[in-house]
Amino acid sequence: MLSLKAQSSVVGKSSSLRLVRNFSKNVRALSQVADETKPGDDDLVQIDLPETSFEGYLLDVPELSYQTTKSNLLQMYKDMIIVRRMEMACDALYKAKKIRGFCHSSVGQEAIAVGIENAITKRDTVITSYRCHGFTYMRGAAVQAVLAELMGRRTGVSFGKGGSMHLYAPGFYGGNGIVGAQVPLGAGLAFAHQYKHEDACSFALYGDGASNQGQVFESFNMAKLWNLPAVFCCENNKYGMGTAAARSSAMTEYFKRGQYIPGLKVNGMDILAVYQASKFAKDWTVSGNGPIVLEYETYRYGGHSMSDPGTTYRTRDEIQHMRSKNDPIAGLKMHLLELGIATEDEIKAYDKAARKYVDEQVELADAAPAPEAKMSILFEDVYVPGSETPTLRGRLQEDTWDFAKKSFAFRD
């Protein structure tokens, strides 16, 4: 059984209220898969990371020993199993042809979205690439809202009009379908935090395949020039589509790509290292040190997208080795057992509850209606409320939309 935290309401006006109401029905705080919090869950526990967890560039690496609470460790485990179950549901729905078009899974990479979110606050902003399902969930969207969007349903986070690559949530600026295009937007989010004197930073994530894009380096330059609180995060999952990193990049130490920006390489398969590095990066940027480049070394178990089997450019033995030796969920489970935070039976109960919850969310998403077959939908959510132009042209003159009338300008 799942108990959900209350989600605070979001304030909006006019047509944005429709967006907020639609989203709020599908939003919840981070899941608490257990029925209740056990006594002592707020007790501090000592975490000792291996020396191989970090490698620094122009900075001293974070402390390898730190303290966190039992409840925080349990929450990260529960979050990761929800994200994985959600991605597995995506795979099944895609094979059933209920999800169509592009769809990119993050199975194997769950530690990054979960570790970052548990290390930052809701004041901070996140933007990433098209592999964004887990980030959307972690920023506050319910599983059913993510899945409904992937299936093109009206109750999706983008009302069924965005699909897999264009998911949004409060404080989460997408999903971006253009390789590397989210990085300058992430720098812009950091500029907004700085301009408004907020104690917050932005996390802009991109893959090793996007790391050679010119706009990434342009963003580095501007962020350093203006000393922005920007955390640039390379999710190095070893392959850009089907191309190994060494075949596309002259230098594969992506954490050093900032040149004049300090960097940190992180074991992205260990959520305890991801969590510590993400907290370190946030503290670094909001303390006035300017931007930082993180490289999360990770691995995707599946192909680049659902249509890619993922075995033509790497061996099955390689994939199995990563699954058996480096799985982030299995790694955290081992720590929970060793630290006495959870028993095998309790972990099995969490896994069972996560499976049940995601199955229920799949049913809700699948039962949701598709967007109405009417042209007026095309003119919704185009402008920030209050900034609309008087009219917006359609394909033909009679398709021109009048925002004041909320109908077509030249139709009776």
Curated annotation (Swiss-Prot):
Activity regulation (record text): E1 activity is regulated by phosphorylation (inactivation) and dephosphorylation (activation) of the alpha subunit.
GO annotation terms (biological process): pyruvate decarboxylation to acetyl-CoA
Domain of life: Eukaryota
Catalysed reactions listed for this entry: N(6)-[(R)-lipoyl]-L-lysyl-[protein] + pyruvate + H(+) = N(6)-[(R)-S(8)-acetyldihydrolipoyl]-L-lysyl-[protein] + CO2
Gene3D superfamilies according to UniProt: 3.40.50.970
GO cellular component terms, A-Z: mitochondrial matrix
Binding-site positions, Mg(2+): 208, 237, 239
Compartments (UniProt record): Mitochondrion matrix
Entry binding sites for thiamine diphosphate: 130-131, 177, 179, 208-210, 237, 304
UniProt keywords, alphabetically: Magnesium, Metal-binding, Mitochondrion, Oxidoreductase, Phosphoprotein, Pyruvate, Thiamine pyrophosphate, Transit peptide
UniProt keyword Nucleotide-binding present: no
Residues holding pyruvate: 104, 130-131, 169, 177, 179, 208-210, 237, 239
GO molecular function: metal ion binding; pyruvate dehydrogenase (acetyl-transferring) activity
Cofactor (UniProt): thiamine diphosphate; Mg(2+)
EC id: 1.2.4.1
InterPro entries: DH_E1, PDH_E1_Alpha_Subunit, Pyrv_DH_E1_asu_subgrp-y, THDP-binding
Keyword Transit peptide found: yes
Role according to the record: The pyruvate dehydrogenase complex catalyzes the overall conversion of pyruvate to acetyl-CoA and CO(2). It contains multiple copies of three enzymatic components: pyruvate dehydrogenase (E1), dihydrolipoamide acetyltransferase (E2) and lipoamide dehydrogenase (E3).
Assembly information from the UniProt record: Tetramer of 2 alpha and 2 beta subunits.
NCBIfam families (alphabetical): PDH_E1_alph_y (TIGR03182)
Protein name, UniProt field: Pyruvate dehydrogenase E1 component subunit alpha, mitochondrial
Gene name for this UniProt entry: PDA1
